Curated annotation (Swiss-Prot):
This is Methyltransferase str2. The structure of strobilurin A was used for the development of the major class of beta-methoxyacrylate agricultural fungicides since its beta-methoxyacrylate toxophore targets the Qo site of complex III of the mitochondrial electron transport chain and prevents adenosine triphosphate synthesis. Compounds such as azoxystrobin (Syngenta) and Kresoxim methyl (BASF) are among the most widely used fungicides worldwide. This class of antifungals are used as effective treatments against a broad range of destructive fungal plant pathogens and make significant contributions to food security. Pfam families: Methyltransf_23. Pathway: Mycotoxin biosynthesis. PANTHER family: METHYLTRANSFERASE (PTHR43591). It comes from Strobilurus tenacellus. Disulfide bonds: none annotated. The keyword Methyltransferase applies. Belongs to the methyltransferase superfamily. LaeA methyltransferase family.
């Protein structure tokens, strides 16, 4: 659908083996931080689970193993890479900017990670996603705020230019690099939800925090940034991410003698549909 649709879902990185590996590593880092659970809330015994923006398929695989009796549908504009899948996982090619081909209230659990921030008017897509959640079901949303508090980067101009290019490339595709911080007020204003839990996590990219759980997540984000901004292939959507910017960013990220600090913010939302 994505290849034929007039509406293309924006994504500033090319989907290839390197990107699949980066997405796997990111999933593993987040899963470890969450204690290898999908969410702290009790999801009950879901029978139908939807993963929106499946990427490498890592989350769908985890969900299928945790809930072997559930049907797990992974949707994305790009196919899941060839890999062993549990028997209860299936893939469907869907562009989230198009109407969903599903009945309303047809999924017990829906998950979407780091997708809404890339979309034009993510809240309008989120509203359609909420419609798909069954009464009493759960919607799990993970998203980010690439905070533009760059004061701690004055001594790391290469890193500052790289992060600025990341933010501007998302904006150029009508995405919102600060989408995560809009989740809580939007969800709390919805009359369709009976419970709203949003956890904000300040995630230092540098220096690495002493807390072991947070340190692992920070190290994951550093590697993810290096993989994303240093990607050999960039789509035409990438704005300002020239070879010079890439090389400067990678060079400074590899150094241990530089004095700089920067934090982004992750948001983990678990919301329950009114019964």
């Amino acid at each position: 659908m994505a290849a034929e649709s007039a509406k293309q879902t924006p994504y500033v990185l090319v989907a290839d083996e390197v990107e699949w590996a980066r997405l796997d590593a990111m999933h593993n880092g987040i899963a470890k931080f969450l204690g290898n659970e999908l969410t702290p809330v009790d999801l009950g015994q879901p029978k139908k689970i939807l993963e929106i923006g499946a990427g490498s398929g890592a989350w769908a695989i985890q969900a299928a193993k945790l809930y072997p009796d559930a049907d797990v549908l992974a949707i994305d504009m790009n196919p899941i890479p060839a890999r062993p899948l549990p028997p209860n996982v299936r893939y469907q090619n869907i562009n989230v900017l198009e109407p969903f081909p599903f009945e309303a209230a047809s999924f017990d659990v829906i998950h979407i990670r780091l997708v809404l921030c890339h979309l034009p008017d993510g809240h309008s897509v989120l509203k359609r996603i909420i419609d798909l959640v069954a009464p009493g079901g759960w919607l799990l949303i993970d998203d980010i705020d690439w905070a533009e508090a760059f004061e701690g980067l004055d001594k790391a101009p290469g890193i500052k230019r790289g992060l600025t290019a990341l933010v501007r490339s998302m904006e150029a595709e009508a995405g919102d690099p600060h989408y995560g911080k809009t989740l809580k007020p939007y969800l709390e204003a919805s009359k369709e939800l009976s419970e709203v839990h949003v956890r904000e996590v300040e995630l230092p990219v540098n220096p690495i925090p002493e807390d072991p759980a947070l340190a692992g997540l920070s190290q994951m984000m550093r590697k993810a940034l290096v993989g994303a901004l240093g990607a050999a292939k960039q789509s035409s959507a990438t704005v300002g991410l020239t070879k010079e910017v890439q090389e400067g960013f990678l060079s400074e990220m590899a150094r241990e003698d530089m004095d700089w600090s920067y934090s982004c913010y992750l948001y983990f939302a678990a919301v329950k549909k009114s019964a």
